Amino acid sequence: MEIWHWFPGRQPEAAILAALTQAGLRHYACESPPLHGPGIVFFDEINDRLFNLLREASCRGVERVIAIGLLPARIKSAAIWSLLGAGASDVFAWDHSSNAAHEVAARFERWEKVDEIVRSPLVKANLAGQSWAWIRALRQLVEVAHFTASSVLLTGESGTGKELFAQLFHTLDSRKNKRDVVVCDCTTIVPELSGSEFFGHERGAFTGAVSARDGAFALADGGTLFLDEVGELPLNLQAELLRVVQERSYKRVGGNSWHKTNFRLVCATNRNLNEEQIHGRFRCDFYYRIASWTCHLPPLCERREDIPVLAKHFINQLCPGSPPDLDDAVHEYLLTRDYIGNVRDLKQLVTRIVQHHVGPGPITAGDIPPNERPRGSNESNDRREQSLELAVRSAVASGLSLRDVERSAGELAERIVIEEEQGNLQRAAARLGLTDRALQMRRAARRQNGNGKP
């Protein structure tokens, strides 16, 4: 694979570059980190310029950046955590050993495999989105599903796609001859029948048990067990399930013999299970058994840039032959509307709009059902102003001055538009109301003032 590398003001030693080449990495030097592609940032001192560069790489989105220190002394733990928090994917101290380059190459190779799966038609056909928050969640799921044998706990609000993630988890599982997914909706389990639902029962175990029956643990043997809304399980049932999750063996209700089962466990919840533990509503030991890995699915309000992508995805599903486009008014309406039910809410709205649409032309504001339309012409502007006010309140509360707020807002707007235009500064400048030259000068000034990348 090909990566870029950047060392402010100089070039790394030839021996370092040769070691990277021998490890199988094709690499090229750049004067400043590009907008796209994985790369390495070399540093011989830890300063604001390094942190700003990593923060900008993180704001741009989805790329992998390894920070490699060429320092005579060991990098302190606090500095490593700060670099990771600023946006580095990993931090290495180059020790000139034969393994250093291979360790770096191994990271990039794994990440490349993960991203190949994330970009694959298998994933894109069912899970649409390109925001950083969404890509990060997909990467976490691919990592645990395809490259480990661990269980995973999916967290997130209702309607964020946890069931689709569970299905993808099973699909990406690399086990051979795996069986199907067994879904247990924990909100519908009747306490009196929970033993039979999970463990199965023998004939005559209770009134009405006219024959033996397999439960979820038997049915999931060789496959995947999905416990949806696991936070709704009562404490006594959590205790009963704990042994099975830990030992992978169970007894049927009314039976005496132990049965082995081998399944991968996926759990999902819209509750904060850490708080539930504090209040005694969820067992700590059960939590740590089901949460070998956790993957949080962001709400739609944290990935609004995905709304047009999702809307187009749903329209393509509803109109596979000739999907209509969205005119500007509908596009803006979808972007600024609130979605209490997250992606599920958006899908239902798009479905109603498409069903109301007639003709080969684009979907227009008149296709929006009357009860869904904004109540006034200023509602969209009001929502944008409310979102902006919340962001400014947060910035001021954190101690930023007016000058800092203005500068940060301007830099963030530039970064977002440049990313959306895939690095095309001419189009980005037009959207920002600047000339090409003005945008280039603003970026150059930030670089000269030590604020990292333009």
Which residues does each predicted region cover?
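Conserved AAA+/SF3 P-loop NTPase catalytic/coupling segment centered on the Walker-B
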Residues: 191-196, 217-248, 263-267, 273-285, ...
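N-terminal accessory segments that target, anchor, or regulate ATP-driven/P-loop NTPase machines
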Residues: 1-121, 176, 301, 331, ...
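Nucleotide-binding/hydrolysis machinery
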Residues: 120, 124, 130-133, 142, ...
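Bacterial C-terminal helix-turn-helix
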Residues: 348, 385-454
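Conserved RecA-like P-loop NTPase ATPase core
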Residues: 137, 160, 184, 198, ...
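Dynamic helix-loop-helix/coil hinge segments at AAA+ ATPase domain boundaries and subdomain interfaces
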Residues: 115-138, 192, 397-406
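Conserved post-Walker A coupling segment in P-loop NTPases
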Residues: 126, 140-208, 218-234, 299-304
